[in-house]
Each structure stands twice: as C-alpha cells, then as structure tokens.
Amino acid sequence: MKKLISALAFFVAAQFALADAHIFNYHRFDDDRHPSTNISSKNLREKFEYFKEKGYEVIPLSKLVDAIKNGEPVSDNWVVLTVDDGYKSFYEKGLPIFLEYGYPFALMVYVEASARKYGDFMTFEQIKEIEKYGEVGYHSYGHLHMVGLNEEKLKNDFEDGISKFEKNMGYKPRYFAYPFGEYNDRVRDVAIEHGIEVILSQNSGAVAADSDLHELDRIPAMNGTHLPSALASKFLKAEWILPQDYPKDNKISELIIKTDENATHGYFSMTGQKTKKVKLENGQMTLKFNKPIDRYKVRMSLKVNGKTATKILVKDINAE
C-alpha cells in the first residue's frame, strides 16, 4: 500500500513538473480603431466562458511567480490575465467583465500617459481605485523602443518612470512588461538593476516551473486569438547560444540552440522564412545561414516534442 501511495505521489509530482500555465496579454477593449490589439466585450465574455467551462483557474500573476520562485508546482489549468498600457477602455469596458467573472488582472502602466492624463489612458487615480481587484506593474515611462535608446536615455526612462510610479502608487513595481515586446540583454539588465523582479515578454508561449522569471512568455489576446491552440502550447527550456543578440553586420552565419530534450529533430521558424525541419544532436540544433536579416526585428522559435522556445532579435544601433 505504501508503495502504491508513493508511486501515485511521484506520478502527481511528475505531472505538475511537466505542467504549463498560460499568461494572456490584453490591450484595448471595444476599440475598433486598433484591431490588432483590440477585443470586443462579446468576444471577451466568450473567452471567459471558455475558461470557466473548461475548468481553468484564473489566478493572480503573483501566485504563478511565487510558485516558480519557490520551486513549487505549476498547474496546467492556471491562467493569468495581463493588461498592457492602461487604456481607458479597460476601465470602462473590460474591467466590468473581469469583475463579473471575478477574474484578477495584472495591469502594466505606461507611466507618462497616466501621469500626464493623456486622453486615451487611465489616470493614476483610476488605477488606484481598481488596484484592489488586481495587481499593478510597470510598462516604462515613455513607451519607447528601448533597444534603440543609448545607455543614458535608457536608464533615465527607468529612473523617471519608476520614481513617478512609486510616487503615485506608494511602492516600487515588481513587474515590468517590455514596450512593443522589444528587448535585448542590455535592456533586460538595466531593468534588473532598477529592482525589477519579473519581466514579461510578448513571445507567445507557455510558462512552466523552470521558466526564467526575467522572461515570461505571454500570449496576445485579441478577437482572433484561438484559445484551444493557445492553451495547448508547451514551454521548451532552451539555451540560445548563437546569436545572443542582433548581429552588427545584419548577418546570422550560424544558429545554435541547446535543449534538454532527448530528440533527434525539431522545427525551426524565423520571421520572413518558412518553417523547416531541423536535426538535433544531443539536444542541440546547429543551423548555417547565408542570407542577411532584412528587418530590424525578427522572431525565432524552435519546436521540439510539442514544446516551443522563442527568442526575439532587435537591432541595437548603440551596440559597440
């Protein structure tokens, strides 16, 4: 009997170890001017009904973060909902539906817009009012393309933004979401230097117990998001050995990605190119390239055994 209980306990632990939570990222609500980042009230309710009917648990971002931080299990039925920018449409259109379902949120604030009371955005008074229903994080001061900023301007943006965030909210932000989803190691390092504990990307994918808290993937949530496909995504632990950043000469001569998966092949995709089947040796993919990169931002992904790892390369004009 003891052996059976031990075996069952091991099985349950193994299942949780392989589980994947999912973070969804919203922007605008009932705002047809911007279809690529908008979701209608009707569509939002349909998606929330799907979570409810399929037994998903919508949890605070902090619950997922603390589980990863403390080495605790991550559940396959966990869903986290984040809202970027702090548009007024969330306050007026989205929030009532979140409250109707009792779903918590994590709001990432574009500080300059809220502090200066830009017309399309929530004020800090409104953010403080709704804070009791969710969590509030940081989305930069000026919502700039951060990779394109020199060191001084990058640090100034963090210092100004975090200072004004703290002045208005009464605490320093724990979370940070990259503007436009664009980043490199330089931006990431400056964020960490300024006390950021958790960084959210816009690399569509899942989150597992061994995810990096400084690079949590999020799934874009808009009218066209197909929930069954999004919720089926699995996290692939991978080390992107080459290239580390956008190459200075605009050319990727070689790609090397290392995973822990015991697999002989996978599928690699890159912006502007067709998905290709690739070989893996001892969990490593090595791929030669000849063509130069013809755009300032490219997204790459490797899928192995149904799990996906994603990396974005953004041209840094300040790279030495």
Model-derived regions: residue spans:
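Terminal accessory/targeting
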Residues: M1-N77, P96-A106, V111-K117, F121-M122, ...
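A general structural signal for short secondary-structure junctions and capping/turn motifs
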Residues: K2, G205-A208
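Metal-dependent polysaccharide deacetylase catalytic core of the NodB/CE4 family, i.e.
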Residues: A21-N38, K54, K69-V79, Y87-S89, ...
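A structural signal for short, well-ordered beta-strand segments and their strand-loop junctions
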Residues: V58-P60, A177, L200
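Acidic, His- and aromatic-enriched active-site or binding-groove loops in soluble protein domains
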Residues: V83, I196-G205
